[in-house]
Amino acid sequence: MSIDIDWERATSGPDGELLAERIRSFIHDKFQQIVLPRFIRSVQVTSFNFGTIPPELEIRDLCDPFPDFYEEDDNENFSESSEEQSPTREPVDRYGSKVESWQANSPGSLEDHMQGRMGFNGPLRMPPGEENTGISPLRSPMNFGDINPYLFPRSRTPGIPGGTSNLGYYMPLSGLSGSQTPLGTVARGSPFSGGWPDVHGARPSRRRSEVEPDSAQSRPSTANTGNTLLSRGSMSSGDPRHSHHSQGVPGSDHGQVLEPNMPPTSSDPPLDDLPPRRMREQKAEDFQVFCRTKYAGNISLSLTAEILLDYPMPSFVGLPLKLNITGLTFDAVAVIAYIRRRIHFCFLSPEDADALIGPEIGSGGGEDTLEPNSPRRKPLSLLREIRVESEIGRKENGKQALKNVGKVEKFVLEQVRRIFEEEFVYPSFWTFLV
């Protein structure tokens, strides 16, 4: 079943301009995290435009949502019931245990409280269970798990800027892709689809950012956009295709740091005591749509940079570079899941699309279509073609000093493909609160 999109209405007007600016700012932030070659300096993304040609959408299948979409974030302190009301929370320590009443109800310091019980001259002793536990280095004085993540900005995690309405981002750093991703086993009906993976060794580290309106943080921008509020996950930003598995250090999300050769302190719980993954309850109204998306339009993206020349000495002079992406060809399978006021969105890699829908859809059809039992010749990129124009040097008498430097174009296009595939292809996905 095909879907018609009013592309002009969706991408024009104040809302369309604001969305384009947020996408521009997001891509700009990603380029600031890239290690540039020695001959390129100061990459800036200056503009983004949706163009006038809409994508073609075709619904291929409806099914139950992926299990990953039901997982709650570690920093997410609201459930379905707490979205409407915020009940009083009992004080807990950093491991989730309830704090004893002598500690929770004491208005003063611990020393004042203990001296008030035993008399001013009485010896100060710690309560049972707290003796000889040592002091954890760099331990945070507050339990960040009990603070609403929307209250405090933490701006180092990349995400969609500009305060878009209730947008979230989630990306496991397990490095799974293609035939190694669990999607292939889901399609074959393995135990992965019947229950949640084990927390030890099977749970990948992940990164998540939440974007809410009306905050004091904003991205670098060339336009006046809305503000954004970001929250940081437990992993720092980096190459998501490398595995960054958790080392099993309890309390690492709350500021505690252990050296690799340092034995754990007695206050650290064993790994078997770690809480299980928190999953939302599955309901009958939850659903997921597989939608084939084809695009061959005139979307545009403009970048500027400086090209450094090393003659007669290193970094002797910088030439201005202007690079314009004037269109692209795109063919992939999108996943849209609706789970109780949340919409999860991502694309499938060609291998995953082959396993779940079929080789004709996964490979994009046409001349790239393979026979059902034939091996894939080469992994395909979702961005099939990117049209680019580049200018290096200033115009003099209507002529360019340099044109179409292939090395610079190749580097920029590789980064555009990498950003797209790392941020939008499963197991990375985006979450919208509706």
Curated annotation (Swiss-Prot):
Coiled-coil annotation: which residues? none
Q: Which GO terms describe its cellular component?
A: endoplasmic reticulum membrane; ERMES complex
Q: What is its main location?
A: mitochondrion
- GO MF annotation, one: lipid binding
Xref: InterPro entries = Mdm12, MMM1_dom, SMP_LBD
Q: What does this protein do?
A: Component of the ERMES/MDM complex, which serves as a molecular tether to connect the endoplasmic reticulum (ER) and mitochondria. Components of this complex are involved in the control of mitochondrial shape and protein biogenesis, and function in nonvesicular lipid trafficking between the ER and mitochondria. MDM12 is required for the interaction of the ER-resident membrane protein MMM1 and the outer mitochondrial membrane-resident beta-barrel protein MDM10.
As for family, the record states:
Belongs to the MDM12 family.
What's the name of the protein? Mitochondrial distribution and morphology protein 12
What's the encoding gene here?
Answer: MDM12
